[in-house]
């Protein structure tokens, strides 16, 4: 009996999903299946390919012939190279990044909410008033710094004068 490893189509229109199956070569695509080896979902990014490597190796060893699309999938997963005995030729299967769990996303949202709103809903008038208030605050801060610097200079001069007077008195 001639056995083939085929793709059996599932899914809705324009959303194909496939099973990688072992069937008699003469059966139709959706016919009786000898064994289900895995799944293939080309619509995901990257495509989801899950093939039971041990069973695929068994069926290839028994003489099952893969169709062209299945052969391409077996090369991607590295099963074909393993069957042929090609050294150092692993598959090029891309794995999707793991999604964050809903609990982690919820905790992040709580942390952001605890920090307070990041953007304020303000009108144009309030924005101008806010900008003017910020400018005033900056000007006041600069004036305070200048006043503090002048006071420090006067204090240094006063200390220097008092030291100079003390030295003059001790010299007399």
UniProtKB/Swiss-Prot annotation:
Provide the residue span(s) of the region labelled Disordered: 115-172
InterPro entries the UniProt entry points to: Ribosomal_bS16, Ribosomal_bS16_dom_sf
Keyword Kinase, does the record have it? no
Taken from the record, one Pfam family name reads Ribosomal_S16
- Which stretches are transmembrane? none
Q: Which GO BP terms sit in this record?
A: translation
Give GO cellular component annotations, separated by semicolons. cytoplasm; small ribosomal subunit
In this chain, composition skew of type Basic and acidic residues spans 147-160
Q: Where is the composition biased (Acidic residues)?
A: 161-172
Which keywords appear in this protein's UniProt record, sorted alphabetically?
Ribonucleoprotein, Ribosomal protein
Citing just one GO molecular function, the answer is: structural constituent of ribosome
Query: Looking at the keywords, is Ribonucleoprotein present?
Result: yes
Q: Which family is it part of?
A: Belongs to the bacterial ribosomal protein bS16 family.
| NCBIfam families in the cross-refs | PRK14520.1, S16
Designated name of the protein:
Small ribosomal subunit protein bS16
Q: Which organism is it from?
A: Corynebacterium jeikeium (strain K411)
């Amino acid at each position: 009996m001639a056995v083939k490893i085929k793709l059996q189509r599932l899914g809705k229109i324009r959303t194909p999903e496939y099973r990688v199956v072992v069937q008699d070569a003469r059966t139709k695509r959706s016919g009786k299946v000898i064994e289900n080896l895995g799944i293939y979902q080309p619509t995901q990014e990257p495509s989801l390919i899950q093939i039971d490597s041990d069973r695929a190796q068994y069926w290839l060893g028994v003489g099952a012939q893969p169709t062209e699309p299945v052969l391409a999938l077996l090369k991607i997963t590295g099963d074909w190279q393993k069957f042929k005995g090609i050294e150092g030729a692993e598959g090029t299967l891309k794995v999707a990044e793991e999604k964050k769990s809903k609990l982690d996303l919820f905790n992040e949202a709580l942390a952001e909410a605890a920090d307070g709103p990041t953007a304020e809903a303000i009108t144009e008038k309030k924005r101008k008033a806010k900008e003017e208030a910020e400018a005033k605050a900056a000007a006041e801060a600069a004036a305070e710094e200048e006043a503090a610097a002048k006071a420090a200079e006067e204090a240094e001069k006063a200390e220097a004068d008092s030291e100079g007077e003390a030295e003059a008195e001790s010299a007399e």
